[in-house]
Amino acid sequence: MATPYYIPEERVPLPPKDAEVLSTACDYCVVACGYKVYRWPVAGGKEGGPKAEENAFGEDFPVSPLGPWIAPNQHNIVLHDGQPHHVVIIPDKDAKHVNVDGDSSIRGGAIAKKCYNPQTPTRDRLKTPLIRIYGVLMPVPWDFALDIAAEVSKHVIKAHGANAYGVKTYSYQYMENTYAITKYALRHINTANFTFHDTPSDVSSTPGFRDAGFDNFAPSYEDWRDAETLLICGTDPYETKTILFTQWIMKGIQNGQKAIFMVPRRTAGVAYAEKNGGLWLDVTPGTDLLLVNAIAREIVKNGWEDSDWIKKWVNNKWESSSGFGQGTRNTPWQWRTTWGLFQTKGFEDWKKWLMAQDEFKLENAAKLTGVSPEKIKTAAQWMAKPDKGKRPKTSIMIEKGFYWSNNTGNTQAISALGIVVGAGGRPGQVIARAGGHQRGGLRGGKYPRNKSPIKVPGRRRRALDTDAYLIAGHTRLAHVIGNTWIQSMCGSQGLAKRFDELVVANPHQVRSFDKQDIIDTLKRRADSGGMVVYNQDIYLVDPIGNRYADIIFPAATWGEETFTRANGERRVRVYQRFYDPPGAARPDWWIIAQLAKRMGFDGFDWKDSNAVLEEGARFSRGSRKDFFMVKVAAKREGKTLHQKLAEFGTDGIQGPVLMRADGTLEETKRLHDTARKLPDTGPSGANRFNKKLTHFNSQTGKCNIQKSPWSLFSDYWEWMRPKGDELWCTSGRINERWQSGFDDRRRPYIVQRWPENWVELHPDDAKARGIENGDYVMVYSERVPAMKDTILGVEPKDFSFSELMKNGHIELSKAAITAVAMVTPAIKPGVAYMDFLHTSQPANALAGRVVDWISGNYNYKMGVGKVRKIGESPYKDSFRSMSFAPRDIA
């Protein structure tokens, strides 16, 4: 049987001396390594030669292994100004920041293959607007598609209200786009039926960080390197943020850093840490809170807390309650920090609470978490025990495997642990997220929380749960932009079933080529209780586009427009356009602007992407990536904002950005920098001194230390806990694939390595089920819980999982996916691990569609199911595709 294979090119052209050189950054993970783009015409057959004076690198070829060589996956042919051009895209060897060694991950290293080229698998890029007529997506002109969309949109808003217009969009795909989208959805439509790609509600992903006063991306990458002890929770940076690990954390480990990983599987990063004296806390899914608080308990029991830091930087109750006035605490962080369930009177009160909880005692926590008491003690010692009177410099890094497991509880617990060990705004002593995607959000409107129908106990509104609202039949128009809504959400197969009912099964289907007939048909569908779907994307996504969308808008992406974005240390950079988008594809800001103008909205008359960014710049003020003063500098110099940002090349400029008295720009290495001195005279000109520059994000500028009750989550965990022959089914990233694999599925090299979905099983679990490497298995559940109502809470218990079950607000459904078994001792017994977003077989189908009722986020990593063999895959006995070799090696 044939399996996917890859035959690499044997020859790659060198750029000639006169090749154009542009700067960009990788389009994938949060690190955003800097890249150089070399571009020259195909016409004439011109290429660089092997001698230094003959090529753009100024190097004699062959070069040393670390020199600027070009791999086959770093070359492509694109159209520029309508003519074929070579492009070579390689890491910037001269970068002074981020990828300082000029290296790349396997993902970024092949980014040239992302570019549209009809001779490659990218040939299926969307090139023209499409409308579904007689069940078939048919090409139509822009005006035709936009006119129809605008008329239907206006009707839905007028007839059913703004909340009937749902917008599900990315939060990161460049500031020019996110500003336009949020201006349209939040400022003009003013819908509360709005959220981003990775959550059902527009809420903070890390509520505990927000409550404590920590910014998600406060540190510089130097801080991760310079920590003496680094606790990494819920991620392996090597697998997910490779350059952050290899060029920063790894160097710290080589210099003696003690790295502690809190994850249920032993990956390459964990193996490297252990080999170099590190520690693996092999936590059972969902029990992170118990483990974190057990470590904290050991620290305070022994008096190892950073008492000087705590005395100076931790609020007492009067301070945490101060500054709110006499109104209600409707803002989520306000009511959480003043609610007795979380709020404390300060450190001593928190300590008293912590020591009184039986579940945090060493032996009890060890039993549920599966982490030995010895490991818990070791972690506490490394993080906090002074050595000859000197405290260790400890930092804490968290990511999705941690905060998507018990969202509010875990982030409250880890924030308190960070405070206890003095992880704040000091070199090598920080606490933050590692990051997933890059930071391209720029808000053009404020979320209208007062329009959300979801009320939690007290006079408190929570952002609308877009999944539950849709399932209840209230969403009459779903506008989906650049994400895989359905597979990316929990209980995804149940969500797909509801899309089928509202869209496909509705009798009002377009069966006419007449514009007015199409408009009238889609209006009737919305009025009948059905749903209309618009989709903007670069590829036809299944099923949101391929099966459900009535109108498809083709988008231009990385390299096809000049865009701006920040990375995980707040470094703002311009991503220069270097080739033409396919067909009639246009950037999302343009699509939104055309739709908005047809709907009668003002303020969308932008001539280019720079105009969008210049308008949006003032909305960056006060944010972690504040770049408004760069715009001020640009105007003083007679330049556009894009031109000014381009001057910083691949290094970019680290926000928030200030302007000195002499007009030069000042960057921010880290937020919460307690040693930073700002002018006593205060900000001058258009400068704004964000509190987070030198203090924490609370009313007083100090940290809030809060309780993290296990009881808020324990009933859900106990119910989900595997029964009989079930396993925990959790998920995450794999090094070679990014997000949904939208680019990776079009790279033969990656498809050969990962041709299908896979599931890791421990040898003991596999043996008990008669499963071997390469077997096809079914992973299934007969009890996937899902919230079926939007309810108004009166008492706190109304939203507890056990109470929701008792009162009939939870329905159970079945789900199943298939995968290729990978048997490995790297995964903890009792746990199965899968790709988090393999679109054809989504792991999220097995995760409960029940939000954390306090934050509104899903606990994506909390799936459960059974596994059984259904046959043998062609990869079981073939060594050409899908290796089963161990990955936890160092």
Please tell me what each predicted stretch does.
Residues 1-304, 316, 330, 345, ...:
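N-terminal export/assembly segments and adjacent metallocofactor-ligating motifs
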Residues 145-165, 220-229, 353-357, 377-395, ...:
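Glycine-rich phosphate/diphosphate-binding loops that line cofactor/substrate pockets in enzymes
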Residues 179-251, 255-262, 269, 290, ...:
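Extended redox/cofactor-interaction regions of prokaryotic respiratory oxidoreductases
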Residues 270-389:
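Long, well-ordered, tryptophan-enriched scaffold segments
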Residues 276-282, 554-556, 570-581, 746, ...:
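Short beta-alpha connecting loops at secondary-structure transitions
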Residues 342-462:
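Active-site phosphate/pyrophosphate-binding segments
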Residues 559-581, 591-596, 823:
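Glycine/threonine-rich phosphate-binding loop and adjacent beta-strand/alpha-helix elements that clamp
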Residues 588-641, 740, 744-890:
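Long, contiguous, secondary-structure-rich segments that constitute the structural scaffold
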